A protein has these predicted regions:
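Ordered, small/hydrophobic-rich secondary-structure cores
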Residues: 1-85
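A cytosolic small-molecule/anion-sensing beta-strand core signal
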Residues: 56-57, 93, 169-170, 185-186, ...
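Conserved small-residue-rich
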Residues: 112-170, 178-179
Length: 215
């Protein structure tokens, strides 16, 4: 896998087909990339565990609960569905998204509204001269966190305690990884492995989400 990629590149839309691809992040948190062709759907079903959805490309409508409440969903959106809740989806145009199944009990930030679609980049603000962090959901095996880097800020090289994927939400940054620099822009992703030495340097203001799976 290329270090810089998009979910759509890994799982492109195919007409008339629903396709899933295991992200191979680990066993404690299932991470899957999905693509649905235009005019396709997934019937309502429910997981016993919390499910998190992150939009990568295209538009879809999620059908939540016994009444199949409709929730519009697009690029950069996030939807968290509690365990035991019916959830399905349909798309007229085609869509690509990431699904996370959090198998263990978790702690969720109080600002998060389960069952409601949220724009990830709008959940966190820039703080002058600072790096802001906001934990969305976490447990002892995973963490999904938002970060906002003000201009001129960055993280010095450090090693990851697990496999991780960055979702660039706004702006641009330079990602240093094992001695090489990569440019990451909004809409792109970056994958690094457990114990991979990495850094983040904002090129202007930069927002990202980070999924870390510790095993």
């Amino acid at each position: 896998m290329n270090r810089v990629f998009t979910i759509e590149q890994l799982r492109p839309i195919k007409d008339g087909m629903t396709i899933s691809r295991d992200a191979k992040m680990g066993t404690s948190t299932g991470v899957t990339f999905f693509s649905l062709g235009k005019d396709t759907s997934i019937s309502q079903e429910c997981y016993d565990a919390t499910a998190v959805y992150i939009g990568a490309k295209g538009d879809a409508t999620f059908l939540i609960g016994e009444n199949a409440d409709k929730k519009n969903f697009t690029e950069g959106d996030c939807l968290i569905v509690p365990g035991g809740t019916l959830c399905g989806m349909e798309t007229a145009t085609g869509t690509v998204y990431t699904e996370m199944i959090i198998k263990k009990e978790n702690t969720m930030n109080n600002i998060i509204k389960s069952g409601e679609v949220m724009k990830l980049k709008d959940l966190i603000s820039y703080e002058e001269g600072s790096i802001a962090n906001l934990d969305v959901v976490s447990n002892d095996t995973m963490k999904f966190v938002l970060m906002a880097f003000d201009e001129g800020t960055g993280l010095t090289p450090h090693r990851a305690p697990g496999n991780a994927i960055i979702f660039a939400l706004e702006g641009k940054a330079t990602i240093g990884y094992e001695g090489k620099d990569y440019t990451l822009s909004a809409g792109e992703n970056f994958r690094f492995d457990k114990n991979g030495l990495h850094s983040v340097t904002a090129e202007g203001k930069f927002k990202m989400a980070l999924l870390l799976v510790r095993e």
